[in-house]
Amino acid sequence: MRNSLAILTLLSGFLLAQPSFTASDIVSNLAGASAVSAADMDGDGDIDIIAADEGGDAIHWLENDGNANPTFTIRAAYGNSDGPWAVVPYDIDLDGDLDIISASHVDNKIRVNVNNGAADPDFDDTVYDVVSGVDARGLDLGDIDNDGDIDVVVAGGGSNYVKWYENNGSQSFSAVNIDVGANNPRSVFLIDVDSDGDIDVLSANASDNEIAWYESNGASDPTFVQRTINNSVTGAMSVYAADMDNDGDIDILAAAQEEDKIYWFESDGAADPSFSATTITSSADGIYSVYAKDLDNDGDMDIMSASANDDKIAWYE
């Protein structure tokens, strides 16, 4: 009897740790939806969406109405990006509101659209370049070397590199190689994967179907050791990480374009973690991007995707 109770307890805990998701469309009219992210862009307490459509060379922000079952309204489109592939919300000018940082692969630029801070914000369409001349397919921002300023990490697409650009503290950046043999990296994400107090790098490498983890050694001039999370994500286009099951460790989401799938790789929480794969959906038609945030403010993580073949931004609740 005690053994039976123990088994039931273990099964109950396992089931509680395995969230399920219900799919719905947020928008379905973006010309080749290529990127999605989410944050409170207007400071009203709910989570809005930023999206890019490569076919229209545009970046959009979609306002959340704040309801328990939210709907989203496209508020603006900004058209100076040539082939936008990644969008990141970040307060780049440290004025208390979130700006939009984007990577565009046709003109090889990383740009910023600056938030004017209004209740119904506009994002300055007179963009300025952060880094030029990069084969920018993916980017993220964070303090990689823990020196108090914001650095940039870039996925170099057809140039097969992952680099970080060290902020020199004077609005200039110096390139540092992380991996010059990455096989067509399309996405990067910064997070402390192993909870050791430093910032690691994740990448999605499309040509070898790999989700890679570059583990930082935590130094002031960090070096990185490459590890493989999974090498069966066919056409790996995007990677994101968060605690999806609220168990205190970092899980990983990945987009497999050639499979139309979103994968969730659940961490086992170890100091040197391993990951177990679960398929969230196999119906994201030509998926380019995946992201996670609590869109409906119900206390759990929701998933968003951008899929180019059906022009959709979708939400998995």
Predicted regions and their residues:
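A short loop-to-beta-strand structural motif that recurs across blades of beta-propeller domains
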Residues: 58-62, 109-113, 161-165, 210-214, ...
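Beta-propeller blade termini
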Residues: 34-41, 85-94, 137-144, 186-195, ...
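Sec-dependent, cleavable N-terminal signal peptides
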Residues: 1-18
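Glycine-aliphatic tripeptides that mark coil-to-beta-strand junctions in extracellular
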Residues: 45-47, 96-98, 148-150, 197-199, ...
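Blade-edge motifs of beta-propeller repeat domains
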Residues: 18-31, 63-82, 114-134, 166-183, ...
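Hydrophobic beta-strand segments that make up the repeating blades of beta-propeller
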Residues: 49-53, 100-104, 152-156, 201-205, ...
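Short coil/loop residues immediately preceding or within conserved phosphate-binding loops
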Residues: 33, 56, 84, 136, ...
